[in-house]
Curated annotation (Swiss-Prot):
Record keywords, A-Z: Chylomicron, Glycoprotein, HDL, LDL, Lipid degradation, Lipid metabolism, Lipid transport, Secreted, Sialic acid, Signal, Transport, VLDL
Gene: APOC2
GO molecular function: lipase inhibitor activity; lipid binding; lipoprotein lipase activator activity; phospholipase activator activity; phospholipase binding
Entry protein name: Apolipoprotein C-II
Keyword Membrane annotated: no
Domain of life assignment: Eukaryota
Tissue: Liver.
Entry GO CC: chylomicron; intermediate-density lipoprotein particle; low-density lipoprotein particle; spherical high-density lipoprotein particle; very-low-density lipoprotein particle
Amino acid sequence: MDARSLLLLWLLLPLLLLLGCEVQGAHLTQQDEPTSPDLLETLSTYWDSAKAAAQGLYNNTYLPAVDETIRDIYSKGSAAISTYTGILTDQILTMLQGKQ
């Protein structure tokens, strides 16, 4: 395995474990009454207005120069992390193999 696949595995494994776990709380009695359609409609309306507000805020504050800077920082940072992950992997494998 190369360093990139090890890093990807290291980052995705906890996420997959978290998503695969089922959260169990105290057992509550289930209600037999169906949820009110008016309540669902109200929640849907609130959700749509929140999405529209967030999209509007994003569109108003978007700066191409900042976006390019963030992309550049991300690419340089991920390259550095890949390098140091490879070094760390080599060190761990050397320690596990021992002197031959």
